[in-house]
Regions:
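N-terminal loops that bind phosphate or other acidic moieties
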Residues: 1-79
Length: 79
């Protein structure tokens, strides 16, 4: 339901490890975790965006956070 996007800035980030953690621990789809050892972009559709943010915060600084309600978007509403 929620389109969750953010950037993680840190050290020794590993997109494969992040992908695996998401797959094993979060319900959702459309996962994209790309970047390098210092910056990873996350895109994920989930009903529990707060869990995604909590985990990502353990990896480094998170910013450019966007959480959009796709149900509202589908009905033509904003937010």
């Amino acid at each position: 339901r929620y389109d969750t996007q953010l950037l993680i800035e840190g050290e020794n980030l590993d997109e494969d490890v992040i992908n695996e953690y998401f797959t094993e621990n979060f319900k959702g789809d459309c996962l994209l975790a790309v970047g390098d050892e210092e910056l990873i972009k996350i895109h994920f559709h989930t009903n529990e965006p707060w869990k995604v943010l909590e985990y990502c915060r353990t990896l480094g600084e998170i910013y450019d956070i966007v959480v959009e309600d796709m149900d509202r978007q589908a009905r033509g509403l904003h937010g």
